[in-house]
Amino acid sequence: MSAFVLGSTGLVGLQILKVLDSSTAFKKVSTVSRRLPSVTSGKINSIEKKESEEWPAIIEKEAKDYSAFFSAFGTTRAAAGSADNFKKIDYGINYEAAKAAKAAGVETFVLVSTIGANAQSSFLYLQVKGQLEEDIIALKFPRTIILRPGILLGERETSKGLLNNLSVGVLKYLHGTPLTFLGNPIFGAEVAQIAVNAAQESFEKGDEPVVKFYEARELTELYKKL
């Protein structure tokens, strides 16, 4: 199998890269990012390209007939600086990458979204995530897998702000306890393992594309079986 990873320097994307690197099922792994990920190996082809507008052409060339494409790419409104920039980054880059992956003949598209994603939401973050989900499904990959994790735990290379850091600091102590339902906290490494496992599962190609959602509570239950 072969895989392309978008967002390989982020919390979940980096963990996906690590899982793929250690997997015996995946023989070839590629990624593109503004800076090189911290994981390196002979299996991984990491492409450093600061200009994200050039990523689709790279993806269409490098991901030709790949088994799977994983996107854990994203930002926050605070980091983006404005609502328009947030949409341009979180939706625009992801969607253009997905179109390139479809043109390249990728079989399975795996999107790491978020709990509560809904294109009709009044909250910008959830609205953008929901619209991205809908539009990627509309591309009709043979199979689309969407994960909607709750609060993501783990060490980030870049901070998402004091409030986020404080909430994560509290919720990590609820992880795996009966109070897990409060935010459904889950480690990025666990989401990554579930994502890669899901992409490895066989499926029957039919007239209609396969679409599979993994909701936050389901993810927190699945990690217990890893």
Curated annotation (Swiss-Prot):
Keywords: Membrane, Mitochondrion, Mitochondrion outer membrane, Transit peptide. It is found in: Mitochondrion outer membrane. InterPro entries: Him1/Fmp52, NAD(P)-bd_dom_sf. The keyword Transmembrane does not apply. Residues 1-43 form a transit peptide. Its main location: mitochondrion. It comes from the Eukaryota. GO terms for cellular component: mitochondrial outer membrane. The keyword Glycosyltransferase does not apply. GO terms for biological process: import into nucleus. It is a peripheral membrane protein. Belongs to the FMP52 family. This is Protein FMP52-1, mitochondrial. It comes from Scheffersomyces stipitis (strain ATCC 58785 / CBS 6054 / NBRC 10063 / NRRL Y-11545).
